[in-house]
Amino acid sequence: MTADEALERLLKSFRQYYDVKREDVLPPFSAEAEFHSCEEGYFLVKKAIISEAESNEYVFFYAAESLSAGDVKRLDGIAWEEGMRRINPHKDHKNSDISVFFLAENISADALKEVKKLKRYKSYNHSFHGYTHYKTVAFDTTTGALAYNRLGSEKKKLFGIMIKELNNNQEGRK
């Protein structure tokens, strides 16, 4: 499976809940997705709003033939800066998460280690105006190797079917 094929399959699962775009994305990324949600709590009638909670997620996808540790560091900085630029914390802001997916046909062992070490967090006004978590996942489309940071572990289930297919294809070749 190529990185572009894996990207298309991943984007298909995101399209259900996210606004996905392939054009006019921040270079060097291949695609972006955004999710916005606003929940309201009210008392007896909907006009008596007692609370609001706004949640956002900004997702960046990078698909290439290869990925090195240097690439991971460079892309990490670009994604974090752009994600932070898009966030507007205010009193009803709960969270705005930033996620990065690295898809490549050849990911170096150092790059996989680097992805696991990535850790970023931001709180706004001592969390009264929300917070930002940073999630990263790297997937080698040739071997099925998967690496993620602590918060990115919740995203690993998106790759389960692709990993099974890769394992079945490799067993069929033996």
Report each predicted region and the residues it spans:
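N-terminal, charge-rich interaction modules
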Residues: M1-A64
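Short, surface-exposed beta-edge/turn micro-motifs
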Residues: S55-Y58, N95-I98, Y134
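A broadly used, surface-exposed interaction patch
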Residues: E57-R86
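Short, flexible beta-strand-to-coil junctions
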Residues: F61-L67, A104-I107, T141-T143
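Switch/connector loops and helix/strand junctions flanking conserved nucleotide-binding motifs
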Residues: G70, S108-K113, L146-Y148
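"Short basic amphipathic alpha-helical interaction patches in structured regions
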Residues: K73-I78, L112-K119
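Nucleic-acid nuclease catalytic cores
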Residues: H90-E114
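Charged, structured surface patches that assemble and position nucleic-acid processing machinery
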Residues: L118-K174
